[in-house]
């Protein structure tokens, strides 16, 4: 396996490969989650650990459990951690449907997940197994994600996920089925002329119904990346 180290800051690196890589959606989700330094966090299906590592760019959470069922993904995260200066990231190789021995049940402030976007057998599936797992609900579904989050979160704890707009009803139904009430929703488009290609949603465990729809996020401008997207990418960079 060929690895490439992607630089987030002078002190934080992500180990990426063709099997476990990352895109813009990871940065959007990390920013949308509004994590705090005192938070106890878990990132489900962490892959190369991009979301926990992004969270290290400014005041990091107290602890972040980075969970993935694939040993190759956890190995890449460990390689990234070896090259970086980080605090509180705990790599965990486990099935989110079963969690792991000693999992902090009912203790977490925040769970994040950038899940597989496609239902199993929907659309063209990649030949590489790791890519299938990342794109299709082969090893877990959005319902499995919400069930795991419900077990991990304390009362009032938050679940933040992203997905394709066509899966919005599935995500809301799964959240509500596990006592996680959708509270914030934001759609993401390339520009004002195009339909959204992504949504970001936050749910709170045990909360009462009321959802705020936030202004749409546009990621492109005439000159390239939009100002807001650039701020999201730049958040936490060391000042010289």
Place the predicted regions along the sequence by residue.
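Mobile active-site "lid"/loop adjacent to the S-adenosyl-L-methionine
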Residues: 115-144
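Short loop/edge segments at beta-strand edges and connector loops
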Residues: 16, 93-94, 163, 186
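Conserved beta-strand segments of alpha/beta enzyme cores
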Residues: 13, 63, 88-90, 181-184
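SAM/dcSAM-binding transferase cores
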Residues: 195-240
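Class I SAM-dependent transferase core
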Residues: 1-36
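Residue-level signal for inorganic ion chemistry
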Residues: 29, 114, 145, 203
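Conserved SAM/SAH cofactor-binding pocket of Class I
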Residues: 31-124
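Conserved Class I SAM-dependent methyltransferase catalytic core
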Residues: 22, 139-196
């Amino acid at each position: 396996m060929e690895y490439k180290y992607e630089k987030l800051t002078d002190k934080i690196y992500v180990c990426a490969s063709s099997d476990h890589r990352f895109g813009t959606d990871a940065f959007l989700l990390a920013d949308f989650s509004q994590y705090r330094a005192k938070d106890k966090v878990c990132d489900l299906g962490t892959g190369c650990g991009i979301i926990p590592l992004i969270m290290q760019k400014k005041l990091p959470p107290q602890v972040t459990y980075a969970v993935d069922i694939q040993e190759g993904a956890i190995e890449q995260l460990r390689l990234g951690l070896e090259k970086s200066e980080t605090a509180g990231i705990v790599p965990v190789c486990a099935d989110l449907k079963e969690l792991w021995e000693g999992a902090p049940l009912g203790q977490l402030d925040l769970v994040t997940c950038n899940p597989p976007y496609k239902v199993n057998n929907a659309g063209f599936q990649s030949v590489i197994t790791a890519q299938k797992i990342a794109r299709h609900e082969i090893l877990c579904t959005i319902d499995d994600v919400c069930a795991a989050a419900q077990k991990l979160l304390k009362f009032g704890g938050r679940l933040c996920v992203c997905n394709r707009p066509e899966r919005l009803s599935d995500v809301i139904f799964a959240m509500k089925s596990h006592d996680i009430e959708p509270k914030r929703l934001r759609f993401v488009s390339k520009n004002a002329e195009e339909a959204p290609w992504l949504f970001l949603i936050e749910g709170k465990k045990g909360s009462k119904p009321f959802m705020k729809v936030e202004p749409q996020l546009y990621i492109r401008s005439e000159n390239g990346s939009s100002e807001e997207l650039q701020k999201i990418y730049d958040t936490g960079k060391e000042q010289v």
